[in-house]
Amino acid sequence: MKAMIFAAGLGTRLKPLTDHMPKALVPVAGRPMLEHVILKLKEAGFTELVINIHHFGEQIIDFLKANQNFGLTIHISDERDRLLDTGGGIKKAATFFTGTEPFLVHNVDILSNADLKEVYDFHRKKSESGYTAGQPAKTSRHLLFDTDNRLQGWIHKDTLQTKPEGFVYEPGQYREYAFSGIHVISPELFHYMEGEAWKGKFPIMDFYLHTCQQLQLGGCIKEDLQLIDIGKPDTLARAEEFLKD
């Protein structure tokens, strides 16, 4: 099984920790956050990883070499010349995901109790183009799913902005969840990234929302999903407690 880890971020929320190191190597409970994600993927049965790099990318390369790639096959998708955001990063790494086998994508700054093998297998059983692990929304930004857990749109509850263009939000008609930073993608999606809008830098969520009416993009909704965004200083201490439990 294959997976991709987003490790190219600038880590601006973690300054000054990221003034001299990449966000992916900021320690959490004595280990770099990248190591936590790699080991979680390895435990779930993933054997081949792609890791994108940008900010202090050479430190990530050295870290992986020093740890013998944790016994896995690891490829580097090098974005040191230009940061491509999540969608552009996935598209740049497309050459590592040939064939029809889906791959899991995981943010480096996320800790969770998600069973990654379960999320991956759930996607394969559904035979959909893409799948995201969702959790009850705690922010004003909500992904909107129908009763079959198919992605229909997005709304910002404070501003009432909606996506995609032309989407009309009807209260009470949707299951509303937050994006977890964990998703599974079928390589067939790369065929839909050929347009001008999907060149260079772009967020993957913009792509999902633009194509959700023509593709089958589903949600693996976990009401008991516990997730911590460790990309912020105030959550690092909570993350250490989370890992102890």
Regions found by a protein language model. Name each.
Residues 1-29, 42-44, 221:
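Glycine-rich N-terminal loop/short-helix segment of MobA-like nucleotidyltransferase
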Residues 10, 108-110:
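Active-site metal-binding loops of divalent metal-dependent hydrolases
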